[in-house]
Amino acid sequence: MSFEILTYTFMHRALISGIAIAILCSVIGLFLVLRRYSLFGDAIAHSSFGGIALGLLAGVYPLWTAYGVSIISALIITKIKDRYNISGDASIAVLLSSGIAAGLVIISFSGGFTIDIFSFLFGSILLVSVNDTVLILALTGAILIVILLLYRQILYSTFNEEQAKVSGIPVEKINYLIIFMAGITVVTSIQLVGVLLISALFVIPNVTAIMYGKGFKQTAIISMSFSVFSVVIGILISYIFDITPAGTIVLLSIGLLGITMGIKSAGLLSKN
C-alpha cells in the first residue's frame, strides 16, 4: 500500500473525523447495547433522514435539521416507552418507520432523490470539510467529557436501574441524557457510514468486545480499538480500490466479529 495517500489533506480530515466518530459510537453504543437498546441508533438515523430531507427542501444545511429531528425523536421514544408502557423495541420500530416515511414524502415534494440525499444515505467521509471535522471533534469531546463527569451515575443506572433510584441517582434524567447524546452521536456519524448502516457502528464493535468477557472498562477499550481499526483500514481500502467507505468499514467490523466468534468457539477466550 502506498503511503502517498496519507499526505492528502482530505484523507487527514477523513481519518481524524472517522477516528473521533468510531470512539464516540463505541462508547455510546456500549451503553445502548447493555440497556437492550441496540436498534436505537438505527431508529434515530432513520428519523433523522426526515430531517435531512427537510433541510434539503428548505435550503438549510441538512445536518442542522437532522440534529433537531433526531433529538426530538429520541425523546419521543423514551416518553412513549415510559408513559404508555410500550416496550423499547416496539417504540423504536414505530419511530424507525415514521422517519423513513416522512423522509420519502418530503423528498417527493422536492423532486426525488438527488446526489446530496444519496451521500447522506450511504455516507461520504472522504468529502468531509474542515468545518465538519471541527464540529465532529467538538461534539465528540463534549460528549466524552459529560460521560466522564457522570460516569458512575450512568454506569450504575445502566446495570441496576432500581438500585440506582434507591441510591438517589436521578435515573430518569440520566436516561434522557443518554438518549440525547445518542441522538447527537447518530447524526454526527451519518457522514461516515450514512443513514442505512449507522447501527453497525453502535452494535457490532460492542457485541464483539462483549464476547471477550472482560469488565466494563476493558470492554469499552476493546470496542473502541476494533471500531477505530475498522474505520481507519476501511477508509484506506475504500480509497485504494475505489469502493464505498461505509460498506468496507461495516464488512471489516463483521469480519472482526466472525474472527472473535471463531476464537470463542475454539475455547481460546478466557473468562474473567
Question: Could you describe each region identified by the protein language model?
Answer:
Residues 1-23, 271-272:
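Membrane-interfacial amphipathic/re-entrant helices at transmembrane-helix boundaries
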Residues 30-113, 209-221, 238-241, 264-266:
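Short loop segments and helix-boundary regions at transmembrane helix junctions
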Residues 145-178:
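Membrane-helix/interface signature in polytopic inner-membrane proteins
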Residues 152-153, 262-272:
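Membrane-interface capping segments at transmembrane-helix boundaries
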Residues 14-17, 62-70, 89-93, 136-137, ...:
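Loop-to-transmembrane alpha-helix initiation sites
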Residues 192, 198-247:
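Transmembrane alpha-helical segments in multi-pass inner-membrane proteins
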Residues 4-13, 84, 92-152:
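Transmembrane helix-bundle core of multi-pass membrane transporters
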